[in-house]
């Protein structure tokens, strides 16, 4: 039996859903699942220190291969002692493959069997990223969990295109496995693609499961499809993945999507959503989204969320935070970012307890009755 550097341990399966309580063991520590992972694109979660992330309860964070390759460079990070040392983070790190960022550059990229040619978004120079190069960069970064290089087709692409795409992604996954220099201390995940086509998702999953990765990601979702379409894909995709390995849904961070993903057996999630909307003054609360810049909060001296015990809510009022953001003070963004990250990490803590108590469906109903499926200011 293969001795993987990444191991999944099931603690409890929820009686009424596909949800599972567990933990993932990595070379830099163990974290509980289901877990939301804050995104630190440039080797930092925007405006948050490592100490703050630990206080929030972030057991693992994500960094971006594409951006770190371009700046400051993966070889420089390797010379510094690796990404953990470079950014002073001694807990697990997951890196993506760079594929999603490359495919976001739709107007300036060319896909071939060898890899992808694209324009550097910083200076316009021509760049080439292959499965082997994506693995080499991540080996230099030294992340605990790495991603295979894949193509992320748009959800509504034609069937024939998606079929060719997933077959190429499977070939790229095999090439990446062969190029992986550090299988003893870095776990490489395969990424299941296939847009909304069940037979293609089945084909992609079968190809990757046969390669025996230590974990599996579900890609190609949260790219414009409806919530119902995402759930339908998860319904037929997650059961295709091994029960004894981690399952990671990429790019998902809306609270309702997190809970529905857990119900369908997903263990890990990431998204830039909490910090991105925080910078615009949008805060997640137990009563829905709150747009703190609105004038009605100018003399509101209550916390962002009456049910939240995070540092922001314990110490600062809506009026003060609104003032900071209106005055373009960075501290305001720090406070809203901290709160939103805490909200999602703490939500997953509550979800884990609901799995333990076998009442996740009731928890979902109660939560969404108050939160309101991401509708802004539902009860304000």
Swiss-Prot record:
Q: What is its EC number?
A: 2.4.2.29
Which reaction does this chain catalyze? 7-aminomethyl-7-carbaguanine + guanosine(34) in tRNA = 7-aminomethyl-7-carbaguanosine(34) in tRNA + guanine
Keywords per UniProt: Glycosyltransferase, Metal-binding, Queuosine biosynthesis, Transferase, tRNA processing, Zinc
Please give the NCBIfam families that the UniProt record associates with this protein.
Q_tRNA_tgt, tgt_general
RNA binding, as annotated region: 251-257, 275-279
What EC class does the entry list?
transferase
Q: What does this protein do?
A: Catalyzes the base-exchange of a guanine (G) residue with the queuine precursor 7-aminomethyl-7-deazaguanine (PreQ1) at position 34 (anticodon wobble position) in tRNAs with GU(N) anticodons (tRNA-Asp, -Asn, -His and -Tyr). Catalysis occurs through a double-displacement mechanism. The nucleophile active site attacks the C1' of nucleotide 34 to detach the guanine base from the RNA, forming a covalent enzyme-RNA intermediate. The proton acceptor active site deprotonates the incoming PreQ1, allowing a nucleophilic attack on the C1' of the ribose to form the product.
Q: What is the lineage of its organism?
A: Bacteria, Bacillati, Bacillota, Bacilli, Lactobacillales
Protein name as catalogued: Queuine tRNA-ribosyltransferase
Any one Gene Ontology BP term = queuosine biosynthetic process
Residues holding Zn(2+): 308, 310, 313, 339
Concerning InterPro entries, the annotation shows: ArchSynthase1/Queuine_TRR (IPR050076), TGT (IPR004803), TGT-like_sf (IPR036511), tRNA_ribo_trans-like (IPR002616)
Species of origin reads: Streptococcus pyogenes serotype M1
Family classification: Belongs to the queuine tRNA-ribosyltransferase family.
This protein's record includes keyword tRNA processing = yes
Task: State which gene encodes it.
Answer: tgt
Which PANTHER family does this UniProt record tie to the protein? QUEUINE TRNA-RIBOSYLTRANSFERASE
Record's subunit section: Homodimer. Within each dimer, one monomer is responsible for RNA recognition and catalysis, while the other monomer binds to the replacement base PreQ1.
Which residues are noted in the entry as substrate-binding?
A: 96-100, 150, 193, 220
Needed cofactors, names only, are:
Zn(2+)
């Amino acid at each position: 039996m293969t001795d993987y550097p990444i191991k999944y341990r099931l603690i409890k399966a929820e009686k009424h859903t596909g949800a599972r309580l567990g933990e993932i063991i990595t070379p830099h520590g163990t974290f509980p699942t289901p877990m939301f992972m804050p995104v630190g694109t440039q080797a930092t979660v925007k405006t948050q220190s490592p100490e703050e992330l630990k206080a929030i309860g972030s057991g693992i964070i994500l960094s971006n291969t594409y951006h770190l390759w371009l700046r400051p460079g993966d070889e420089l990070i390797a010379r510094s002692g690796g990404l953990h040392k470079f950014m002073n983070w001694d807990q697990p790190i997951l890196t993506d493959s760079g594929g999603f960022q490359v495919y976001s550059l739709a107007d300036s990229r060319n896909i071939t069997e060898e890899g992808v040619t694209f324009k550097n978004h910083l200076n316009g120079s021509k760049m080439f990223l292959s499965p082997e190069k994506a693995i080499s960069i991540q080996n230099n970064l030294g992340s605990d969990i790495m991603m295979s290089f894949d193509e992320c087709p748009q959800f509504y692409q034609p069937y024939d295109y998606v079929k060719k795409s997933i077959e190429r992604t499977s070939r790229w996954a095999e090439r990446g496995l062969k190029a992986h220099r550090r299988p003893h201390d870095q776990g490489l995940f395969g990424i299941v693609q296939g847009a909304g086509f069940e037979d293609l998702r089945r084909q992609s999953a079968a190809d990757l499961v046969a390669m025996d990765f230590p974990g599996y990601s579900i890609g190609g979702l949260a790219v414009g499809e409806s919530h119902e379409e995402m759930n339908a894909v998860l319904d037929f995709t997650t059961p295709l993945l091994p029960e004894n390995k981690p399952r990671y849904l990429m790019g998902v961070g809306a609270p309702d999507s997190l809970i529905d993903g857990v119900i369908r057996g997903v263990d890990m999630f990431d998204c830039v959503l909490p910090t991105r909307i925080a910078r615009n003054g949008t805060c997640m609360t137990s009563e829905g989204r709150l747009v703190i810049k609105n004038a009605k909060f100018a003399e509101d001296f209550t916390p962002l969320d009456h049910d939240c015990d995070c540092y922001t809510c314990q110490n600062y009022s809506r009026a003060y935070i609104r003032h900071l953001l209106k005055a373009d003070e960075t501290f305001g963004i720090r406070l809203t970012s901290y709160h939103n990250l805490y909200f999602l990490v703490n939500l997953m803590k509550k979800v884990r307890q609901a799995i333990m108590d076998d009442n996740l469906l009731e928890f979902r109903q109660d939560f969404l009755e108050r939160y309101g499926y991401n509708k802004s200011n539902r009860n304000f």
